[in-house]
């Protein structure tokens, strides 16, 4: 049987007694509107950070190819193919330089497989295994983007030299 949430009067067929909390409902609506405005502002900041990062990577590694649609993409996400190196080698080298990234999809962390998402996009396995994915949930500063792009430039240059 269904038990009443609150005891008391007979509102809601005796299952939920009490007067509706109008002030609480209004406060909730105001809070949701403010939260939505903050989310939209953060979305714009993430898009600007992502685009700044993409531009910086393209500047320091012109051979790198951005994966996915150039316009319709997640705000805090950039994925590249780096010809001539494996994503795993690039990942290890970047980690040694203090940069955290991934060579596969977020749902496959810890597995050493070719990213299924890239294969589904039509990339050949030999190309897909040279992927590097960078994700962030807070906007990046210009200094952070420069640090990341410098590390990518040095790492990619070192790895393609050998």
Annotated model-derived regions:
Residues 109, 113-162:
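PLP-dependent enzyme catalytic core of the Aspartate aminotransferase-like
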Residues 1-43:
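Conserved core segment of the aminotransferase class I/II
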Residues 10-12, 75-77, 129-133:
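Short, solvent-exposed beta-strand edge segments and adjacent coil->beta transition regions
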Residues 22-25, 32, 50, 54, ...:
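A general structural signal for well-ordered alpha-helical segments in protein cores
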Residues 32-55, 65-74:
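Structural signature of PLP-dependent enzymes
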Residues 65-116, 120:
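Conserved PLP-binding catalytic core of the aspartate aminotransferase-like
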Residues 57-58, 94:
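Hydrophobic C-terminal alpha-helix "anchor/cap" residues
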């Amino acid at each position: 049987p269904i038990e009443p949430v609150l005891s008391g009067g007979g509102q809601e067929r005796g299952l939920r007694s009490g007067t509706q909390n109008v002030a609480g409902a209004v406060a909730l609506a105001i809070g949701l509107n403010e939260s939505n405005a903050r989310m939209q502002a953060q979305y714009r900041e993430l898009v600007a950070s992502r685009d700044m990062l993409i531009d910086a990577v393209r500047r320091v590694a012109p051979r790198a190819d951005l994966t996915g649609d150039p316009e319709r993409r997640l705000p805090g996400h950039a994925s590249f193919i780096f010809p001539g190196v494996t994503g795993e080698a690039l990942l290890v080298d970047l980690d040694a330089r203090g940069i955290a990234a991934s060579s596969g999809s977020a749902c496959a962390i810890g597995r050493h497989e070719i990213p299924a998402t890239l294969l589904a996009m039509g990339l050949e396995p030999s190309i897909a295994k040279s992927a590097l994915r960078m994700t962030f949930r807070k906007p990046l500063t210009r200094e952070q983007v420069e640090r990341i792009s410098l590390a990518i430039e040095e790492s990619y240059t070192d790895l393609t030299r050998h």
